[in-house]
A protein has these predicted regions:
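Hydrophobic helix-and-loop "lid/oligomerization" segment in the mid-to-C-terminal part
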Residues: 1-99, 104-137
């Protein structure tokens, strides 16, 4: 019985984490129109949870997204889609345009859009610029 309670608590904690991530995603998602398709762009969701959160977003009728793109600090984009949209083609072409590779499956794919060090440099520039503006210390 003790082991059952332990797994029940783990399941509850996991479901709470997913619910919190879904709420976060709905707050930070940005709309992007791509050739008449509604894309949702999200920054800050760990790769381990992207497929689960994408499914929740893509099949939520109130949100009505056809593609979800997850941007991350490593300079990569992960795409998820529903219906007839082949995001592997998008990832492949986007990766080629920016000089990196990309691809995957019809409904789940990804590509690199910039180097990790380049992304870090840009983030540090934004951080430094912002810190210099507040003049607290």
């Amino acid at each position: 019985e003790e082991i059952f309670n332990y797994f029940f608590l783990l399941d509850e904690a996991y479901n709470l984490k997913i619910d919190n991530l879904f709420d976060f995603a709905k707050r930070v998602i940005s709309d992007f129109d791509y050739k008449g398709y509604k894309l949702g762009v999200i920054y800050g969701i760990d790769g381990d949870y992207q497929s689960i959160i994408a499914d929740k977003i893509l099949f939520d009728k109130k949100l009505d997204y056809e593609v979800v793109a997850f941007l991350n600090v490593y300079g990569t984009v992960s795409f998820r889609s529903k219906n007839d949209i082949d995001v592997s083609d998008i990832a492949k072409k986007l990766g080629m345009i920016v000089g990196y590779s990309g691809g995957g499956h019809k409904h789940a794919s990804g590509c690199r859009i910039c180097d990790r060090d380049e992304m870090k440099k840009k983030m540090m520039e934004i951080f430094e610029h912002s810190m210099n503006k507040i003049k607290i210390l």
